[in-house]
From Swiss-Prot:
Its cofactor is thiamine diphosphate. GO terms for cellular component: mitochondrial membrane; oxoadipate dehydrogenase complex. It is found in: Mitochondrion. Signal peptide: none annotated. Residues 298-317 are annotated as: Disordered. This is Probable 2-oxoadipate dehydrogenase complex component E1 homolog.
Amino acid sequence: MLRYLALSEAGIAKLPRPQSRCYHSEKGVWGYKPIAQREFQVAEDVRASRNSQANVYRFVEAFRQHGHKLAAVNPISIRTSQQELQELSPAFYGLQTQEPVRTDGLLSGPQVAHNVAQLEQLLKDIYCGRSTSAEFSYVEDIEEREWLARNFETLDQQQLGKSERCEIAELLIKSQAWDNFMALKFPTVKRYGGEGAESMLAFFWQLLRDSVQANIEHVVLAMPHRGRTPLQAALLNMRPAKVFRKLSGASEFSEDIEAMSDVISHFHVSEQLKILGKKLSFSMVRNPSHLEAANPVAMGKTRSKQQARGEGAFGDGSQPFGEHVLNVILHGDAAFAGQGINQECLNMAYVPHFEVGGSLHLIVNNQVGFTTPGDRGRSTAYTSDLAKSIQAPVFHVNGDDPEALARVTSLAFRYQREFRKDIFIDLNCFRRWGHNELDDPTFTNPLVYKIVHQRESVPDLYAQQLAKEQVLSESKAKEMRDEYMKYLGEELALAPAYQPPPSYFEKQWTNFQLAPSKELTYWDTGLDYSLLHYIGQQSVTFPEDFNIHPHLLKTHVNARLKKLENGVKIDWSTAEALAIGSLMYQGHNVRISGEDVGRGTFSHRHAMLVDQQTNEMFIPLNSMEGGNGGKLELAHSILSEEAVLGFEYGMAIDNPNNLIIWEAQFGDFANGAQIIIDTFIVSGETKWMESNALVMLLPHGYDGAASEHSSCRIERFLQLCDSKETSADGDSVNVHIVNPTTPAQYYHVLRRQLARNFRKPLVVVAPKTLLRLPAATSTHEDFQPGTLFHNVLGDTIAKPEQVRKVILCSGKHYYTLAEEREKRQAYDTAILRLESLCPFPIQELQAQLAQYGNVQSFVWSQEEHRNMGAWTFVRPRFENLIGQQLHYCGRCEAPTPATGIGKVHKREVDEIVAAPFEL
């Protein structure tokens, strides 16, 4: 039973010490439910065997911990002799070579050792002597360690059949043939082929087979450029004609689409594959050249698909995350060690509201980054060592052994299914050419490339092995190659006439379209106030046994109820709750992500309440009755911008019917995610025809908080938009940027995101001081049916015939200007607010200015410095399209957004507020 106000402010009992020191959700909230701890005990006979042979057990554990250091997993090693490790010597543990041992309980597998010497050889064969090695001794969970040891030590029992080996060989041959064909027909193209790393095809071959057998329905992949195109062509059903058409100078999209497009190494795949007679959806997310940046995008897209299927905490709890949707990430060796976004992604792996049920990682380890060798590209022994930060197991594999990779892939897949955790495969391979095929790597890596150029290719070595074992004849291998080369030749001939099929606005995007390019559209986003009143009440409703904070009861709950009842002084947080709650009522799910979003940086939102006795979380809107069942997910993020924003972008591109909001703690910190903003959010549609309605809330405003807590860098977002300077914008601009000044405006712009039949990213220059400013409130009439977001707010004070000066501004600066006008009684001055900056609202602005026939001057006033803010954006559009000179009033040029000296700040405020009236 829920209630509004069952507790009096004075009647809240003193609370006992909580069991948990931090807020939590033991009961679960939308998007997160605690996972019950698994019970595991090492069998009694196993413990007895280990205790009775303590030193022998230590010896076995030493190989599990250190054996990887001696494993022959590097196909181009220039090390001439194998080093010795004292930790792997029997004498180190006081053991004699002929001392009898029992392997029961110590080692898995059919092989038996009767003495220490035999055991040593057996351990060397398992952990040092084959094409694979393992690292998992640092995994804290004993069940996982036991599982990994048992399954790795029996890995060789899983042998491939003849037909399976031939399938792998054919894939490797196709990959090599692709690169050979490209080199022959397009010798000057930087194709970033897979030569030297062709074994990765065996990874995907095994992964797809295991996936369908485990009832996986959808695989989402993030992958960099290396080997991307041959994989797409050989295994993922991409027509080679698409690539060849692109290389002839045409677009990868149909001719009616005005897209700027991208290079072939950024092509994506979204296909339904047929594997072992079963259907499997496969999505390779689009990637920029910023390495690893696509990884959180894939994670977010994966979680969105899991949400749509009701997995994990989005359902009844009967199936964990990852039950039917699997996330897979490929890395480059230098990029995985070097790019900080990887640490951020791993840090998110098991965080509530970001978990995806464990990701499967493959590091394609070329052992060089452009020209930089590993010891110059990281401070650790392995490129995979970052994985240890989350205790993810790592398997190292020699790239010359595709069958070993297939076996390890199956093992890694089974681990992910069993424990729903991340796991890594480090594929040690090489890059046959330089960073691209036109680059000469011998300038900087002569010894390595002496080995590379003298050795045969991986596909040829494997084909020779199969021929020797009478599995695949040389003639059959040649036939495979010739047939594929013939097919590629046919595709090349078809390329000029090839028309790419639409790969956008499909499935869940079917009912959407591109935004109109020649007009601004207007959408009624108002609702009946009785419904909004109910939603507002529900936003502060909590259970009878819930122990609310007394201050929140007074200032948040009671205050909101009073505002709703009176229909006046509706503040920012209430308007936000009405927007979100009404979207939920209409059946949309809403997600707010970022640091401290439940409470809000400025303690204004309180969409999440915390029981003061139990620390249990409660989200009132998720208990709202009636409507179509939308839910609110409050995703308190790690202290990261780049990976978190990438994750939210991944969710936004997958489902256009959900509202995805990312809030920066302060707008100043958005630049920590600049790569995601630049290469995905504002450019994804024009490069890839990938729309999104992601909302970025960026708190902004000069209030004396110095340079890092004052500015979201409006000017940078305006520079990124493709608004025109000399003609009117349509809704088709790449990003919509608003600076709303009233709660109702904020309400309408949020609801508009999902009301339209197209999707655009939205940057909201969000308030700080306006959150509690009495003047910055709205009334219930502002939310009623027929109301909408206004791109320009006109002046309601000055009489048009008396106006001699018009001040244009945007954002909270309006309120200081209005206060100054009141002080001066300067009613010959009108103040217009540009609520929308992009698209630039020239029609609405012209309509407002048409009222003022006696204007003598136009002023742009802003609180930002002259080289910042919207001045350089507004001025050319105003002067070109209005035909009048626009004067500037604001702070002078500066290299940093705001002063840290209180006296200087106050003086600047006085000056910039007075200047427009004295000009």
